[in-house]
């Protein structure tokens, strides 16, 4: 390569980067994710009892001020699984986190932020769930554990399933979401308010809940819940 061409490469790269920056949409333009924050509560979701909850101060403090939350705790309404009347029965947590203007300060890769909440030994793998409307979606399934207390010295096991929902997109990994977001910014001129949808619960043999039972209940809730809140007409 001739010296002149080599000298021009940095300038060409800088011009290309400047062009990308200028091509990005304005900061105040956000396209809403194709998912409703209004998860059903009470007995509105057949087979389940839902109770709306508030995000914690810890969750709020580490995310941008314009991050939006929607959280509902569910218990199976059938005594064949576990009763919402039993205050000691496991709860299945469903949450949606909507990004703000600065997505990097609103939505994080779960495998990175969950350890900060006390979860450890995280392992992830791809999974698919068939929904009640006949559609099949890809998820990431995380297994982890969290200490019950220093005095006990043992842990509860946790299962989480998650996806990212954009405008007309459902992505099962953080990398897929980032790539889609970059494509939309560069080629369609849009900035999306991405939503992070997660459902999880805990299990332990000494409380009478096996991993298989916990996993089955989480999958059953997702199968019933997502058809109610995803805006399928956008897909």
What feature does the model see in each segment?
Residues 4-19, 127-235:
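A short, solvent-exposed beta-edge/loop patch
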Residues 19-26:
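Alpha-helical transmembrane segments of multi-pass membrane proteins
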Residues 47-49:
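Short conserved aromatic/hydrophobic patches within beta-strands of well-structured domains
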Residues 52, 57-185:
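Short, solvent-exposed recognition patches
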Residues 41-45, 115-117, 193:
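Generic detector of short, well-ordered, non-transmembrane alpha-helical segments enriched
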Residues 26-45:
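Alpha-helical transmembrane signal-anchor/signal-peptide segments
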């Amino acid at each position: 390569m001739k010296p002149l061409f080599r000298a021009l490469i940095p300038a060409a790269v800088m011009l290309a980067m400047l062009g990308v920056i200028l091509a990005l949409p304005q900061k105040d333009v956000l396209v809403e994710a194709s998912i409703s924050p209004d998860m059903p509560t009470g007995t509105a979701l057949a087979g389940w009892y839902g109770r709306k909850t508030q995000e914690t101060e810890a969750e709020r403090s580490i995310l941008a001020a314009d991050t939006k939350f929607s959280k509902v705790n569910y218990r199976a309404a059938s005594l064949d699984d576990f009763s919402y009347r039993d205050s000691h029965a496991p709860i299945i947590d469903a949450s949606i986190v909507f990004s703000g203007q600065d997505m990097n300060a609103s939505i994080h890769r779960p495998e990175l932020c969950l350890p900060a909440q006390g979860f450890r030994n995280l392992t992830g793998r791809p999974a698919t769930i068939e929904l009640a409307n006949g559609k099949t979606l890809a998820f990431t399934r995380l297994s982890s554990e969290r200490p019950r207390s220093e005095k006990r010295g043992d842990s509860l096991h946790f299962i989480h399933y998650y996806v990212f929902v954009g405008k007309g997109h459902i992505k099962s990994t953080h990398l897929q979401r980032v790539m889609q977001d970059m494509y939309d910014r560069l080629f369609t001129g849009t900035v999306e308010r991405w939503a992070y949808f997660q459902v999880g619960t805990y299990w332990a043999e000494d409380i009478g809940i096996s991993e298989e039972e916990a996993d089955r209940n989480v999958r059953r809730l997702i199968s019933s819940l997502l058809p109610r809140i995803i805006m399928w007409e956008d897909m």
